[in-house]
Swiss-Prot record:
Record-linked SUPFAM superfamilies: Annexin (SSF47874)
Predominant place of localization: other
The keyword Ribosomal protein appears for this protein: no
Molecular function terms, GO-annotated: calcium ion binding; calcium-dependent phospholipid binding; phosphatidylserine binding
InterPro entries linked: Annexin, Annexin_repeat, Annexin_sf
The organism's taxonomic lineage, starting at the top: Eukaryota, Metamonada, Diplomonadida, Hexamitidae, Giardiinae
Family: Belongs to the annexin family.
Domain characteristics, as noted in the entry: A pair of annexin repeats may form one binding site for calcium and phospholipid.
Name under which the protein is recorded: Annexin E1
Primary role: May function as a calcium-regulated structural element linking phospholipid bilayer and underlying axoneme.
Amino acid sequence: MANKNYQMSTGVTAVVQKVVEACQDESKRLDLIEIARSYPPNQLRNMQRTFQAITGTFLDAFLKKHLSKDFESLVLMLYKPRAQLLCELIRGATKGAGTDEKCLVDVLLTIETHEVREIRQLYYQLYNDSLGDVVRKDCGDKYMWAKLINAVATGDRIPRDTHELEEDLVLVRKAIETKGVKKDEVSTWIRIFATYTRADFRQLHKMYSAKYNGDSLRAGVEDEFQGLDEYAFKLAHDFLYDPCCAAAFSMNVAFAGSGSDSNRLNRITAMHFRECKGCKYYYKKVYGQAFDERCATELKGVYGDAIKLLWEPVTVPLLSMDDYQGSEQHRPMTLEL
């Protein structure tokens, strides 16, 4: 092994050894998942550096050598820093023979407000290109989902006052009551989903339900759009209301059809399993089936076990208080219905 004199904590060294054993022994594959869910991202980054120092091999290359198929793709995503993962997903979706519209929708419509600037900056550093320009150039503005993600990629979320909320309440009601998809009404939805803060959107949600006999904004979105447009606007609605809702919705869509969409399962899981502690609860509440039962039906082997395990609520252990550098906005999301 390379660089045997490399100094590191016993804890990190033990994690590296556990990764090596899990890759080499198929019966220990789920240890890779336990590591990902049990340590915060900054400690995983430290582990990757230690892994290279001890073994002389990049962790990504080692994982690719020993793992395969959907499980390999999932683990590779889990061990990447979140900002890097988001940038790589966007880059992969916009380069090549065609645009991966589903990936762009999943990523850009489920990024937290405090992350947007960091993602824009990192994307430029990695690829010497503007995130907004890339998305706009690749997707155009012909489709409503494209207009929405363009607005999210280039816009900012700004707090509203009570008067602005009341004005938008009128506009939203008009959009829902209007038959057919009209330009002005679509613009209203896009502006709200792309520029509202979560707190203001929840307030608008409550105001709408109170004023219109319990009617739901989400039902209005469902009646308004179809296909990928419907998915995108529902996802934007759910993520603003509670990321747990968005995760459960997206996972349910990934399970639908003749075969599960493992690409969507992987990216939604890797992006949100840490923060969305209420996903399984919400899934059962809305879709009427336990999440683990659906996984057992749709997914096979260690891959299915990994997906189930990652969405199980867990308290991430911090080795020291110095490892926690976030403020309230970075704390794990809890379900609020």
